[in-house]
Regions:
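Active-site beta->alpha loop and helix N-cap motifs at the rims of alpha/beta catalytic domains
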Residues: 1-6, 10-86, 90, 124-127
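Charged, compositionally biased N-terminal leader segments and the immediate start
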Residues: 1, 209-213
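Catalytic alpha/beta core domains of metabolic enzymes, predominantly
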Residues: 78, 90-183, 189-210
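Generic alpha-helical propensity signal that fires on short helical segments
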Residues: 24-29, 34, 58-62, 84-86, ...
């Protein structure tokens, strides 16, 4: 099942650093070689408009399956509407990331055309980490984006396998899932009795390895 649900690939500067990438371009090219027939989102890492645009234009040349990933705002909280609109008008496929609210989604939709493909990545897990329920933001974002056949809403920042079902139930077009979580999706469909048996077996294995005595 996990392999069947994988339809594309995305990364960001933080994940690249965690993966040990030393050279942005060569690392990205390796990804594109592996995922040559699937959509791949590659993120700019500049914080200023001019450099961000230069990077976006270059990244866009790396493949027809590339989505250029740009943040909805820079590190100072400045809305990146100008670059979003310009790149969209150049028919560059975009993945607009670090979105948290339907208000941000609405601002994006006011700028883009209705033909060039756009992904809006809403960070569910990080929002939930602060005690905020991301579901209402998804519901509203999905609703207002319905008029745009070229726009897909993405559930980002997954925290648990159940998020996969939540995203599907809400009508999200895409959900980004780390490999470890994809493997856990194999547990879907197991009965509570099966889970109890597996859990107790794990306790037994660990207690034997620990050589516990009372």
């Amino acid at each position: 099942m996990p392999k069947k649900i994988v339809k594309g690939f995305t990364t960001n500067p933080s994940l690249m650093r965690k993966a040990g990438a030393k050279d942005y371009k060569s690392y990205s090219k390796k990804i594109l070689k592996i995922c040559n027939n699937k959509p791949v989102s590659l993120e700019v890492f500049a914080d200023e408009y001019k450099q961000m645009k230069q990077q976006a234009l270059q990244i866009n040349t790396w493949g027809k399956n590339v989505y250029v990933k740009v943040p909805v705002a820079n590190s100072r909280g400045i809305f990146m509407g100008k670059i979003i609109k310009e790149l969209n008008n150049l028919n560059i496929k975009l993945n607009i990331t670090a979105v948290y609210s339907a208000k941000q989604t609405e601002k994006i939709l006011k700028l883009i055309n209705k033909k060039t493909r756009v992904i809006i990545s809403i960070f569910a897990g990080r929002a939930a980490d602060t005690g905020k329920d991301p579901v209402p933001e998804f519901k509203k974002s999905i609703s207002i984006a319905k008029k745009f056949k070229n726009v897909e809403i993405l559930w980002a920042s997954v925290r648990e396998p159940y998020n996969f079902l939540q995203a599907k139930q809400l009508g999200c077009h895409i959900i980004t899932i780390p490999p470890a979580t994809i493997e856990k999706i194999e547990n879907f469909g197991k009965t509570f009795d099966q889970l109890t048996k597996e859990t107790v077996k794990a306790f037994l294995v660990d207690s034997k390895k620990s050589k516990f005595k009372i």
